[in-house]
């Protein structure tokens, strides 16, 4: 297959700088992207070639404005284009720079005392929940072995008449009972 004869090629240089498409013919020493259009031999349609400078062009954030322009594949502004190419121009506006320190998660500092307090509160709630589960699961126990109204405090001395403990039939034996505080409501006593 024979190579086609070499013909002079006219090139129109379109420069994209800072996101705007311009038709200027000069080259700047900035990082920029060039669009070259060159006609092919024996065809009315030209080839579209893209070239880029060695340094990458960093694009900032959007908003985006779109503009459509007609470009003749032959590059000749006087001749009507056979098949026009439609190019969209993106105009990007810079946004605020992001500081790496601002991207790190901002966690409030909690004191050790607050952590210990939260842990002990959680531990008390866990123990109370376990006690309630044990109480629920012990439904087979005789009714006199569980006392929900027994106070957490030991009974007053025999000479003190201010507090009267519950009747002896509901009072658990001291050696086999366990009392758990459940907040403002009182205590749960579990008997084995």
Swiss-Prot record:
Q: In which tissues is it expressed?
A: Predominantly expressed in kidney, pancreas, ovary and testis. Detected in brain and in many other tissues.
**Keywords from the UniProt entry:** Transcription, Transcription regulation
Q: Which InterPro entries match?
A: DMRT (IPR026607), DMRT-C1/C2_C (IPR031577)
Look up the domain of life of the source.
Answer: Eukaryota
One biological process term from GO is: regulation of DNA-templated transcription
Task: State whether keyword Zinc-finger applies.
Answer: no
Identify the GO cellular component terms for this protein: chromatin; nucleus
For region Disordered, the annotated ranges are 142-176
Name the family.
Answer: Belongs to the DMRT family.
PANTHER family named in the record:
DOUBLESEX AND MAB-3 RELATED TRANSCRIPTION FACTOR DMRT, DOUBLESEX- AND MAB-3-RELATED TRANSCRIPTION FACTOR C1
| This protein's name | Doublesex- and mab-3-related transcription factor C1
Q: Please tell me the species this chain comes from.
A: Homo sapiens (Human)
